[in-house]
């Protein structure tokens, strides 16, 4: 593969997509992704198991006991079908004000629900790296997220922390030093770190290039960062305007050309 050595399905692996009707699983889109990955020897990261958005509509109407069963059945079904999944975003955006899964909080009332969900993932996905994923992790909400996830980390069920990196430039441009300091602080918790959803929302080529050159080397060279995922790459096909790095005809934007040259030079060291 010219550009990538890891795949993260953006929507195809979310619970509400796969199990829109309880007990009926639609694996068609995911099967294609895993087949492609296996043929090309590319690891897959699952995204995501438990989130307050894009969950099946039927889950909120169940009793707590049935919600617990449904969550476990979903996790078990996924990892039974795709046991070679290398990494999993187990819980996504659980900080209050983000998108915490109310159904999971209800299912495990009286306990730390994040820890309980990770325990289920550990039980059924023993060979996968289990990750907590959230936005504003490197910026405004670092302390809140660390406080939220610490019990699960202390319980030994979290392997990595995923830092969505969509908004490093608006409404404030975070300097390279500020991002390094944040990585140091988060890394002190002891888990692996992942830049999980990196994009640069800039239609101006020079602006996108400048931001890429500012932050990517900080990610790449930090000892705790084990991987970087770009959140979409084809212009006009990404979730936010201006984040694409390659035109549909294959022409690279300057930020992509710089990135490829940077990685080539780094690997030659």
Which residues does each predicted region cover?
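Aromatic-rich peripheral "rim/lid" segments of glycoside hydrolase catalytic domains that contact
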Residues: 19, 57-60, 77, 81, ...
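Substrate-binding cleft and catalytic face of glycoside hydrolase catalytic domains
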Residues: 2-20, 28-139, 189-191, 202-204
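His-enriched metal-coordination microenvironments in redox/metal-binding proteins
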Residues: 40-49, 158, 165-171, 233
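Structural recognition of alpha->loop->beta junctions
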Residues: 1-6, 67, 73-87, 149-162, ...
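Extracellular glycoside hydrolase catalytic/binding regions
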Residues: 128-180, 191, 195, 202-214
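Short glycine-rich, flexible loops that bind phosphorylated cofactors or substrates
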Residues: 15-16, 170, 237
């Amino acid at each position: 593969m010219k550009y990538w050595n890891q795949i993260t399905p953006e929507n195809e692996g979310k619970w509400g997509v796969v199990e829109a009707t309880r007990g009926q699983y639609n694996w068609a889109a995911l099967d294609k992704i895993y087949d492609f990955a296996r043929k090309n020897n590319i690891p897959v990261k699952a995204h995501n198991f438990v989130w307050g958005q894009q969950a099946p509509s039927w889950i909120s109407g169940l009793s707590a006991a049935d919600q617990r069963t449904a969550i476990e059945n979903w996790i078990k079904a996924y990892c039974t079908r795709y046991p070679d999944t290398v990494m999993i975003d187990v819980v996504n955006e659980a900080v209050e004000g983000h998108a915490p899964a109310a159904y999971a909080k209800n299912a495990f009332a009286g306990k730390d629900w994040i820890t309980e969900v990770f325990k289920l993932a550990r039980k059924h996905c023993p060979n996968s790296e289990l990750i907590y994923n959230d936005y504003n992790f490197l910026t405004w909400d670092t302390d809140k997220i660390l406080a939220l996830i610490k019990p699960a980390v202390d319980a030994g069920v979290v392997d990595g922390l995923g830092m969505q990196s969509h908004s490093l430039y608006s409404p404030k441009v975070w300097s390279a030093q500020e991002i390094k300091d944040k990585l140091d602080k988060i890394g002190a918790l002891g888990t692996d770190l992942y830049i999980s959803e990196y994009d640069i929302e800039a239609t101006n080529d020079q602006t996108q290039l400048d931001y890429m050159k500012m932050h990517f080397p900080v990610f790449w060279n930090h000892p705790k960062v084990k991987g970087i995922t770009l959140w979409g790459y084809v212009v006009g096909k990404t979730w936010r305007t201006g984040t694409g790095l390659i035109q549909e005809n294959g022409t690279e934007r300057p930020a992509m050309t710089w990135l490829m040259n940077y990685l080539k030079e780094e690997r030659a060291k």
